[in-house]
Every structure is written in structure tokens, then in C-alpha cells.
């Protein structure tokens, strides 16, 4: 379920808003330049690779690239692999890479093909936890301080859009705020 929970930056228990209403979510985020759209989902095999995923969403991907000036697109997939003894360590490392507050010099645009993840947007004196699910397209403006949680058992596939080949370069703030907020798992229980 797509939802937003807005909390005071210094008190995670001071919840100003929690809603799964898509119109209310979009209206809440729009003043900050954050866009949330929805694409229809396509039938894909569980192990669909990058080429198959991009082919299934070719028209939408081309439109986002044209409108936003994105020249590089890739697909990232992280799904549980209980038969792989390395899986827990790989999942923890992947999760840890994005859990600290940072910003980028370009927009962060993601389409969730499957699964879910949470963008935490530090805007003014509040944190907006935006849980995205399959079908959600989110665009976070360049310079927005944020972090991302994929959960303790990551399960998602996302199409990522970049202006430059090295587009995901985080400028980390050094703030410990991410460690004071509820995790994705806590938000969705």
C-alpha cells in the first residue's frame, strides 16, 4: 500500500499525517516538487531481467526520459534468496548503502515494478516517509535531503532514471536523523 507518514524531525511519535489516499499524498508532496504517479503494471516472469523489464515499460520509460532529459536507465532487483547463504549479508549491505541521509545533484526518479520501499524526505522541520509499492513512479528533486529503506528482507524491482552514467552519487549530510525514524518494516507492520 502506498502511504505517507509525516513526522516531526525531532520526535518520530509526533505524527502530523498518515494517509494512504493517493490524492492527499500527491497534494502533500507537490509543494516540495515531489511527484508521485501511477503506471499500470505489466505481467512479467518473477525472474525478468533488465531487458524484459525495460521492454515491458518501453513507452513509459521513453516518455520519462524525453520529458526529464534522462539518458541512462537501469533496473535494480533485490529479492529474497533463502537458498543463498550470502543473501543476508548482501541484503544488509545493500540496505545500509542508502540508509543515511543524503542528497543528489540530479533528480532521483524510480518506478517500482514489484515490491516496495520507503523514501524518507527531510523537508523543513518534518520527515515525510513515503512508502512506494509496485506501480508507483516517484520523482524527488535534486538537492532534497532524503534516505531510502528497502526493509530488513528487501523485495523490490525498480527502474532507475539518470541524467549521467554516474548519476547515483550521494552527498551525505552526516546527520543521524535516519536512525531516529521508524523503519519501513515498522511503518507497514
Swiss-Prot record:
Belongs to the acireductone dioxygenase (ARD) family. Pathway: Amino-acid biosynthesis; L-methionine biosynthesis via salvage pathway; L-methionine from S-methyl-5-thio-alpha-D-ribose 1-phosphate: step 5/6. Monomer. One of its GO terms (biological process) is L-methionine salvage from methylthioadenosine. SUPFAM superfamilies: RmlC-like cupins. It comes from Nocardia farcinica (strain IFM 10152). Catalyzes 2 different reactions between oxygen and the acireductone 1,2-dihydroxy-3-keto-5-methylthiopentene (DHK-MTPene) depending upon the metal bound in the active site. Fe-containing acireductone dioxygenase (Fe-ARD) produces formate and 2-keto-4-methylthiobutyrate (KMTB), the alpha-ketoacid precursor of methionine in the methionine recycle pathway. Ni-containing acireductone dioxygenase (Ni-ARD) produces methylthiopropionate, carbon monoxide and formate, and does not lie on the methionine recycle pathway. Ni(2+) binds at residues 102, 104, 108, 146. The record marks 110 as: Important to generate the dianion. Disulfide bonds: none annotated. The record marks 101 as: May play a role in metal incorporation in vivo. Its EC number is 1.13.11.54, 1.13.11.53. Fe(2+) binds at residues 102, 104, 108, 146. Transmembrane segments: none annotated. Its cofactor is Fe(2+); Ni(2+). Keywords: Amino-acid biosynthesis, Dioxygenase, Iron, Metal-binding, Methionine biosynthesis, Nickel, Oxidoreductase. It comes from the Bacteria. GO terms for molecular function: acireductone dioxygenase (Ni2+-requiring) activity; acireductone dioxygenase [iron(II)-requiring] activity; iron ion binding; nickel cation binding. InterPro entries: ARD, ARD_bac, RmlC-like_jellyroll, RmlC_Cupin_sf. It catalyses: 1,2-dihydroxy-5-(methylsulfanyl)pent-1-en-3-one + O2 = 3-(methylsulfanyl)propanoate + CO + formate + 2 H(+); 1,2-dihydroxy-5-(methylsulfanyl)pent-1-en-3-one + O2 = 4-methylsulfanyl-2-oxobutanoate + formate + 2 H(+). The lineage of its organism: Bacteria, Bacillati, Actinomycetota, Actinomycetes, Mycobacteriales. This is Acireductone dioxygenase 1. Binds 1 Fe(2+) cation per monomer.
Amino acid at each position: 500500500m502506498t502511504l505517507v507518514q509525516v513526522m516531526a524531525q525531532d520526535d518520530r511519535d509526533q505524527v502530523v499525517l498518515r494517509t494512504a489516499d493517493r490524492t492527499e499524498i500527491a497534494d502533500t508532496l507537490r509543494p516540495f516538487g515531489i511527484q508521485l504517479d501511477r503506471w499500470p503494471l505489466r505481467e512479467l516472469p518473477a525472474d525478468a531481467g533488465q531487458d524484459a523489464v525495460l521492454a515491458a515499460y518501453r513507452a513509459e520509460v521513453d516518455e520519462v526520459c524525453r520529458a526529464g532529459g534522462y539518458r541512462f536507465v537501469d533496473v535494480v532487483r533485490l529479492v529474497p534468496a533463502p537458498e543463498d547463504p550470502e543473501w543476508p549479508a548482501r541484503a544488509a549491505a545493500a540496505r545500509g548503502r542508502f540508509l543515511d541521509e543524503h542528497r543528489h545533484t540530479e533528480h532521483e526518479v524510480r518506478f517500482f515494478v514489484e515490491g516496495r520501499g520507503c523514501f524518507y524526505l527531510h523537508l523543513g522541520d518534518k520527515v515525510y516517509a513515503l512508502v512506494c509499492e509496485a506501480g508507483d513512479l516517484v520523482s524527488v528533486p535534486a538537492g532534497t535531503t532524503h534516505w531510502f529503506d528497502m526493509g530488513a528482507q528487501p523485495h523490490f524491482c525498480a527502474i532507475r532514471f539518470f541524467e549521467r552514467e554516474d548519476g547515483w552519487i550521494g552527498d551525505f549530510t552526516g546527520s543521524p536523523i535516519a536512525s531516529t525514524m521508524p523503519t519501513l518494516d515498522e511503518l507497514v507492520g
